[in-house]
Amino acid sequence: MSERLRVQIPGLDLKNPIMPASGCFAFGIEYAELYDISKLGAIMIKAATKEARFGNPTPRVAETSSGMLNAIGLQNPGVDEIISNQLKKLEKYDVPIIANVAGSDIEDYVYVANKISKSPNVKALELNISCPNVKHGGIQFGTDPNVARNLTEKVKAVSSVPVYVKLSPNVTDIVAMAKAVETGGADGLTMINTLVGIVLDRKTGKPIIANTTGGLSGPAIRPVAIRMVYQVAQAVNIPIIGMGGVMDEWDVIDFISAGASAVAVGTANFTDPFVCPKIIDSLELALDKLGVNHILDLKGRAFR
């Protein structure tokens, strides 16, 4: 892989800045049957909680214009099973793992972070304080700066690897949230998570999602995501992994231009399971067209 795409941020030596977003790539093993996942910059695996979660009732997914709504509810087999099974299977691949950590209270987050950060192939944690689809935990931690800072401090104290905090767009001031978790010791940020929305059944007029609301993702949210990255990148001194509606290499360049250091691809994996390697293969040609040598030469050019 060309050095033109290599990116180094806390805990992560990325051969390229492209990674699948948590919740859109399962645990990566499934995609390993389709292509060499070692080609990816990193893998953000599905959220881990202290105990197994069965998620929200169905229906949990609805298609929207230029996107989708989901309310999966952090379904996962629990941190112990993830460590002994899914993470174990990923050890043979040359790709750093970012483990997504979720919980119902601070004690849950601390428990999961302490355990999963000790796994040899986990190089960073993604602290999920912004999931809008669970009744307890998630978004309640992601909308109060003081609560978010406190949680970040507690997780940092027990984590063996750098901690990236996933920010919610469902706030009035995302810069305040970013500064709060930076003060709490966050090594980096991932942003943005989904926007809260509702899709109605045209015949009944009732919400399609059993949970009523869900998280909106896909190209529809990309301008919002880029705006928020643009704002936060100028306010903090820690790196950002940008995400929100990325479909191709030019979307990646937009996020880098807005101030991100790396980019995660989410919903696009459902429409094209090969989207990540396709983007990686196209990035250098895009750099050539722009007349730049390295991907990070574009970082923050929107406000420089």
Curated annotation (Swiss-Prot):
GO terms for cellular component: cytoplasm. The keyword Flavoprotein applies. GO terms for biological process: 'de novo' pyrimidine nucleobase biosynthetic process; 'de novo' UMP biosynthetic process. It catalyses: (S)-dihydroorotate + NAD(+) = orotate + NADH + H(+). Gene3D superfamilies: Aldolase class I. The keyword Oxidoreductase applies. Pathway: Pyrimidine metabolism; UMP biosynthesis via de novo pathway; orotate from (S)-dihydroorotate (NAD(+) route): step 1/1. GO terms for molecular function: dihydroorotate dehydrogenase (NAD+) activity; dihydroorotate dehydrogenase activity. FMN binds at residues 22, 46-47, 100, 128, 166, 192, 218, 244-245, 266-267. Substrate binds at residues 46, 70-74, 128, 193-194. It comes from the Bacteria. The active site is at 131 (nucleophile). InterPro entries: Aldolase_TIM, DHO_dehydrogenase, DHOD_1B, Dihydroorotate_DH_1, Dihydroorotate_DH_1_2, Dihydroorotate_DH_cat, Dihydroorotate_DH_CS, Dihydroorotate_DH_I. It is found in: Cytoplasm. Catalyzes the conversion of dihydroorotate to orotate with NAD(+) as electron acceptor. Belongs to the dihydroorotate dehydrogenase family. Type 1 subfamily. Heterotetramer of 2 PyrK and 2 PyrD type B subunits. This is Dihydroorotate dehydrogenase B (NAD(+)), catalytic subunit. The gene is pyrD.
